[in-house]
């Protein structure tokens, strides 16, 4: 990066150490490398790339004190740090399982938001990701699929926000403690190896004692989203609303 912009590094990466500390606590697996650096490159075409222990980022993420209340690199920083576990320590075997890298990084960056900014901000982030998913409601391709002609096609809403939402639903279904235990086991058992989605499924089923085939079939291996029917009834006597939601 230009020497003239080096003073912006402290603003841009003010959260990096806190992110590393939080992920070690939340994931339960120590940071797996000897060091961690951020390097900003001029004319870098992507937002960031999670090279093991050395993330490369665009200089567009740099900012000064004058704009610190208008912008933040926290989300990108947390996303790339999360990849040190999900993408570097353990990585997808082929592009069809990219969500195992990007979905986890997307979700864990939101978990860091919850840690530092609270649950309402976390929910706001989830809502924003959901809007990104439903903006592609005509899409008929599942998260895991091999019908792509170029790997770049896999870097889509399916791997990022939809993958993150699948993890959030699974965490909500199983509870935070069990989810955390499953993720820790997944990383420890497959560290320095490549994985497919079934490797993740097997660990969640083993530790939960439940079959999750319906969950993963519906949300990962099949496309679209569920259609629901909502029934609304007002009880004048009790002044209460009876609301029922059923999947069609």
Give residue spans per PLM region.
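Hydrophobic alpha-helical and helix-loop surface patches within well-folded domains
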Residues: 1-246
